[in-house]
Amino acid sequence: PATGKELDMPGLDLHALHSDYDSLCRRGIGGIAAERLAFSIMHGNGNVIIVVDEALSGLLGDEVGSGLAREICESFQAIRVDGIAFVRIVTGVVQMTYYDRDGTNASMCGNALRCVTQYGVEQGYLAAREDIVMTDDGPKWVSADGGRIRVCLGTGREFQRVDADRYFVFTGVAHLVVLLGDHQDLEAVDVRTEGAALRYDDELCRRLSHSEGLHVDFMQRHAAGVRIRTYEVGVEDETRACGTGSAASAYVASRVWGVPGPVRVGVRDGEIQVEETERGLVIEGVTGHLFGTIAPPVPAPATAVQRVPSRA
């Protein structure tokens, strides 16, 4: 496995990651020899995503799916993998298909899109200045200009007030944003329990027309912007960061609390900045490699292969 691009993460045991990979190679995965998989374990502000390069792996279309994604996630015990982003190139355009760790095909993951952007630029699949990645939520504008990984999730959609302290907005996936007052303690929130109760609230899901369930963001004002903690569908637990959740929270904070943009959203691991632009909600934060089998990157092309307008 390649180790030259690894970044430090608190509590990460690289020896244990190597052991997990060795075990994976011995037993194979979904009928596929693990040595075939060209992948990088990456993270976006601590949200751990495995990027699998379908072309370098020689994967066929029917080999990629929910079962393979779930099995790959479960194969690593040294670190919780929150999801898998499969990357392919079709007629010169990079496509991303994302699965949560439970195998659910999600239309969008903001942090996965950031990881794919960094990976795509490093491998020469994407232009650094700006380019387009096709997703299940439509084409998305991405940029790694100057080393800043910025991606556009489109505009906030279906925005509505649910009740006094809860708002809904769709930012590629469905988010319920729960507002906390100054007298409340964000750190005291039992995100796993309270988040699950709202995520599985059938009446609320029907009311909002999202039977797939709701991601839940608990948000509190902060001197520098806002802070959030997120319960994610498909992980069924709190994650260290959520890109679509940061975008949803910033969208709500600007409209309900009047927080000026760009909104700084504090997450478990650092900060994600959200800016509303003509293209839509643009998120920016830390991304990096932790472990993988990908060969050293090649220079990125000077210009994009193809331009497609980003869907709002």
Predicted segments with their positions:
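A glycine-rich beta-to-alpha transition motif near the start of alpha/beta enzyme domains, typified by
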Residues: 1-146, 169, 177-312
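Active-site glycine-rich loop that binds ribose-phosphate moieties when present
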Residues: 152-166, 191-193, 197-200
